[in-house]
Design a protein with these regions (language model features):
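A short, N-terminal "cap"/entry segment at the start of jelly-roll beta-barrel domains
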Residues: 1-46, 55-57, 89-93, 132-134
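Glycine- and acidic-residue-biased ligand/ion/polar-headgroup-sensing regions
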Residues: 63-82
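Short acidic-glycine-tyrosine-enriched beta hairpin
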Residues: 81-103
Length: 134
């Protein structure tokens, strides 16, 4: 066993990646709190907050695969089926989850008040977000 920075690690055990503080990104629609974005492990974790009356752009990702978990409020998710072009809309409530696969155009809207949700996804690259409309 080795001691490192007050922690004891067994031989061969990988150390946890330390992150001093979450990164906060202010958006015109609310904000994102980035807990992790790790290219090596292909992993990203954020808390998103969308203010009442606001929405994200209609966009898609070629590489990013996302899962949402609603922690507060209601989230309206508008998406477009990439096979037949049919537009779909659904309302997610606290405790609901939704998985969005790569390539699916989607827009997220605070429905009837502010909304907060956790996004777990593959690694986030700004260049992978393709905006269709604001």
């Amino acid at each position: 066993m080795k001691k490192s920075g007050g922690q004891i690690w067994r031989e061969g055990q990988r150390k946890m990646k330390e992150q001093a503080k979450a990164k906060v990104v202010e958006k015109e629609w609310g904000r994102e709190i980035w807990m992790a974005n790790n290219a090596e492990e292909n992993y990203c974790s954020k808390i998103l907050q969308i203010n009442q009356g606001y929405n994200t752009s209609l966009h898609f990702h070629l590489e990013k695969h996302e899962t949402f978990y609603i922690t507060k409020g209601q989230l309206q998710v508008d998406s477009i089926c990439t096979i037949n072009g049919v537009k779909m809309s659904r309302i997610l409530n606290e405790g609901d989850t939704l998985e969005l696969k790569r390539g699916v155009p989607h827009q997220l809207t605070a429905y009837d008040g502010d909304v907060e949700f956790i996004e777990i996804s593959t690694f986030h690259k700004d260049s992978d977000s393709k905006r269709i409309s604001r």
